[in-house]
Amino acid sequence: MKTQDDKKLDNPVWFSLSETHQNFGVDYGSVKFYYPDYCPFGGFEKGDAIAKSIDEYSKMVDNFFIVGEKPELSNLLKLNKELVCLQMIVYDAIDIPTKDKIVKLTDQHIDALYELVNLVQPGYFKRKTALLGNYYGIFKNDVLVAVTGERMQMNDFVEVSAVVTHPNHTGKGYAKQLVVHTVNEIFK
């Protein structure tokens, strides 16, 4: 599924909130953020009042992330950390078999999903994040031990997110199987 819109991936939060997820965010004009109870991410396009808009959003949260280029910030905010992230694109379904039972997570799994993701990657996953897309898990002895799902979504792309395995269950291929399953579900 190669597309001419690959450039949207340079600013994924902006385009997700401009397209598929427009009902999940705060729109300040040239700056857009997910509502804090969904995801603490924002993005911006060149324009006016970027620092002021970011200051406004900062009143709603303890911390947040700007994805993409680094904006100019006001003196009201302190930059805590800069992260370099790698972005990979899958253009076709993946032909790798899965051996473990993969379950589509529902409302009854939200607490277990939230706890597992925040055990491994604290701060990025909120209670309502799972409402942004489908999430899948592997259970062992009725305990959720590995997950992945769909977070940011725009018209042509879906982020595979929350690729998490409980530390006591790593090295068993669960993440690989879940990524394959999630990617293939996206392509259906």
Model-derived features: positions:
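Short amphipathic alpha-helix that is part of the acyltransferase structural core
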Residues: 2-7, 91-123
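A short, internal acetyl-CoA/4′-phosphopantetheine-binding micro-motif in the GNAT/acyltransferase core
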Residues: 40-45, 163-171
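Conserved acetyl-CoA-binding loop-helix of GNAT-fold acetyltransferases
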Residues: 49-53, 165, 171-186
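Conserved active-site alpha-helix within GNAT-family acetyltransferase domains
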Residues: 73-76, 176, 188
